[in-house]
């Protein structure tokens, strides 16, 4: 089970044996690259922040010490950071994609399947946001210090501003940038860290026919790889953990880790990064109106609210699973 199996082979059909030291070296190399991607993201945000603050210097200097940036400078910072991150990490992912594990799981989505997939992801997004809100309402009162910190954060203009540009930055630019970074770049590098047998996959030089499915490798490789479930979940946990840590606080980090696992599974199931982006978009956008769904809570009570959440998640997962089921395959 622990080895990377070829689609048409058994566990005994393995390539070169890789020593323990080689495995450790491979894992260290690719995990260092994943951490490097996170550091690059931090550096980009820092550079954009300095540039935006320089442009709005007069307005920023008028803000009392200790207070957060608000108004136009904040919105400009959110938009500029989102665009910069999206351009850099979408570009990096497009470079990695032809030689990626995800590319080998990709299947064609006609318009009908894409519409059903989007509908399923919308249900999941609303259900996940409702579930997070309900769980936090139960858990946060037990930890007053974390509750106060989180309430202050969510009450800040970053999340409460409903201007179009601000909502676009949170609901569109952030999902594109974060999914390209974590479920694209970091997830791919994490898979390489735990699957050293697949080196021919990322060493080959893809031709212009790559996206049409015709592979021309300079390094021989099996026509298809099947990553075992333990290795997938190990790589998925790595990217989700880094996703949670990047959020910078315990409460957001905890549910970002859980969401990262879901986003990773969604992309892996479909073999397409846009599925994770759309789900992330649905989760973030529903943040702005999930409070309005409290009418369900008042009308039906806790049980009714929970039933509504379970129904949304169950319908979303079932529909998405049906849309992305591969013929003759029972794997996730």
Question: What are the residue ranges of the model-derived segments?
Answer:
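Short, Lys/Arg-rich, polar N-terminal cytosolic tail immediately upstream
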Residues: 1-23
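Short, charged juxtamembrane terminal tails flanking transmembrane helices
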Residues: 3-9, 211, 323-332
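Alpha-helical transmembrane segments in multi-pass membrane proteins
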Residues: 37-98, 147-148, 306
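Hydrophobic core of alpha-helical transmembrane segments in multi-pass integral membrane proteins
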Residues: 38, 82-94, 123-131, 305-324
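Juxtamembrane helix-loop-helix connectors linking adjacent transmembrane helices
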Residues: 57-67, 71, 101-177, 187-227, ...
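Residues that define the loop-to-transmembrane-helix transition and helix capping
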Residues: 233, 251, 271-274
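Hydrophobic residues within alpha-helical transmembrane segments
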Residues: 238-242, 278, 282
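C-terminal membrane module of polytopic membrane proteins
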Residues: 281-332
């Amino acid at each position: 089970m622990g080895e990377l199996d070829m689609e048409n082979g058994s566990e005994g059909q393995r390539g070169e044996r890789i020593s323990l030291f080689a495995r450790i070296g491979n894992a260290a190399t690719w995990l260092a690259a994943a951490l490097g991607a996170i550091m690059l993201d931090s550096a980009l945000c820092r550079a954009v922040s300095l540039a935006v603050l320089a442009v709005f210097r007069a307005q920023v200097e008028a803000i009392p010490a200790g207070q957060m940036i608000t108004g136009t400078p904040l919105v400009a910072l959110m938009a500029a950071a989102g665009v910069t991150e999206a351009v850099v990490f979408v570009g990096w992912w497009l470079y990695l994609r032809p030689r990626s594990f995800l590319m080998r799981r990709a299947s064609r989505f006609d318009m009908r399947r894409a519409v059903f997939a989007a509908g399923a992801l919308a249900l999941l997004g609303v259900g996940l946001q409702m579930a997070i809100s309900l769980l936090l309402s139960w858990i946060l009162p037990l930890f007053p210090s974390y509750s106060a910190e989180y309430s202050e954060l969510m009450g800040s203009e970053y999340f409460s501003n409903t201007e179009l540009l601000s909502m676009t930055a949170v609901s569109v630019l952030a999902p594109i940038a974060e999914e390209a970074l974590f479920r694209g770049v970091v997830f791919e590098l994490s898979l390489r860290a735990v699957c050293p047998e697949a080196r021919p996959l990322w060493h080959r030089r893809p031709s212009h026919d790559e996206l049409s499915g015709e592979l021309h490798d300079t390094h021989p490789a099996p026509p298809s790889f099947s990553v075992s479930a333990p290795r997938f979940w190990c790589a998925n946990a790595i990217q989700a953990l880094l996703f949670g840590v990047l959020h910078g606080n315990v409460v957001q980090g905890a549910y970002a880790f859980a969401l990262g696992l879901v986003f990773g599974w969604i992309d892996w199931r479909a073999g397409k990064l846009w599925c994770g982006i759309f789900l992330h978009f649905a989760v973030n956008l529903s943040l702005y109106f999930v409070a309005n769904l409290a009418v369900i809570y008042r009308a039906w009570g806790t049980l009714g609210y929970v039933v509504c959440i379970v129904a949304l998640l169950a319908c979303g997962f079932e529909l998405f699973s049906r849309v992305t089921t591969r013929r003759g395959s029972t794997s996730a």
